[in-house]
Amino acid sequence: MNIRDRLEARSAHYSFRAKLAVVWILIFVALAVLFAAFRFDTAFMLQWLPFILAGVPLTILISIMGILLAVPLALLGALGRLSRNPVFNGISGFYVSFIRGTPLIVQIFFIYLGLPQLAQYAPGPLQGLFILGTITSGVLALGINYGAYMAEIFRAGIQSVGHGQVEAAQALGMTRTQTMRRIVLPQAIRVSIPPTGNEFIAMIKDSSLVGIVGTQELFFRASKIGRQYFQNLETLVIAALIYWLLTSIFSYFQGRLERRLARGYVREGGGPHGH
Amino acid sequence: MGTEARPVVSLRGVRKVFGDNEVLKGVNLDVGPGEVVVIFGRSGSGKSTLLRCINLLEEPTSGSVEVDGIRYEAGPGNRRRRSAMREIRSRTGMVFQDFNLFPHLSVIENVVEAPVTVNRMPRAEADRLGMRSLEKVGVADKKDEYPIRLSGGQKQRVAIARALAMQPEVMLFDEPTSALDPELIGEVLAVMKDLALESGTTMVVVTHEMGFAREVADRMAFMHEGNLIEEGPPAELVGGARDPRTRRFLEAVL
């Protein structure tokens, strides 16, 4: 027996999970070595950890508000892209194209700095609507930006519902609107939820861009302390680890949600083919 | 068919063109109350398109469709045509080859969906009506299951119940047993036979089940290259067809 055969025979004794655990442990050891190589000032890091952590609630708040704004925009965008009404179709086509085609950071600045310049044209009582705080600007920009991306997700979800479903609904006398609301959308939303979870996780990280206009969220706090004491890497490592932890937690819940959603569509229990 | 009774379905000069392919070449068809008409013929002869023109899932290129006194004249879409289209659809029930049950709804929800959404029937009343439909097709015990947990035969019977719940004037069947495993065909045909013979339902059926046609149909109509070229009671048509194309097809399938 050569070495390779002997290794394979040995390896067969251990489960995949055990081997996977070993790989993860080795990765963490490597990360620890890398961390040590940077000779970070750990006392400094521990000292400012609570200050940076205090940005977490705002980061989560901005992300949740952002996704709550993005979902209805995405739904409208998707329906518009599929609509035969030229005005609705044109506006949503522009929305998706322009917003996906320009950087989020530019959009944030346009809403935060650009909108107030238009306030002078608005009637007095409405001027306040053009001058937004950093958090509102950030939520608006994130919601509008992610709405454009998610419009494509929802559109694919709607198109994934077979034409037979539409025909069955129409054969029963349902109008186009009834067919969409009662038959197509419920099925489209089910397939759209997992990718929407992905977008939410991406949004948690992109909320750091809102820090650039001065929102006291996670990234803003980390970079502020880093610049103040010329120890940027220390605070940014903390921020990175916190973002990783946050997204891991949401990934876990996303996985559970996906399994739960699959349930209604899986043949389970006794005798699916019983007569 | 009583000659003086107004037909439930009346097609006049129905043509349907897809691109440069003329699938229907001016078909006339009358179906009287309580009548069962089986349309048969080779695949690609236009049978399904003809059936789908009755409830306007396919809009005829020219000609007219009348169902239960609601008349639809071919032409560009406008408010009047769309409303006639919906009126006709709510008076016809359709059963598809591949069932097309709504997978996100339970069996009873599938059945009450249209009565509640289209006819604005109160849910309790729709439930009673839905249960009667399910009992008629023998799947009342599955009312809370989701379609994925049903066999093909059960799915098709639920689809029949869903169409019946709209209390249609005419039931359209588009190859209702073609997607079924052979051992499940019988239960669906039995339900259809019961609808035809016991309940006196007006039916237009596109099928390859010649045994069913001979036993249940009042009239059989042979479709060939976009035309209905011969029709008559099964007893006359089978063995006594005048057109050689009908004779050849019947000899091949029987």
What is each stretch, according to the model?
Chain A
Residues 1-275:
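Transmembrane alpha-helices and adjacent helix-loop boundaries
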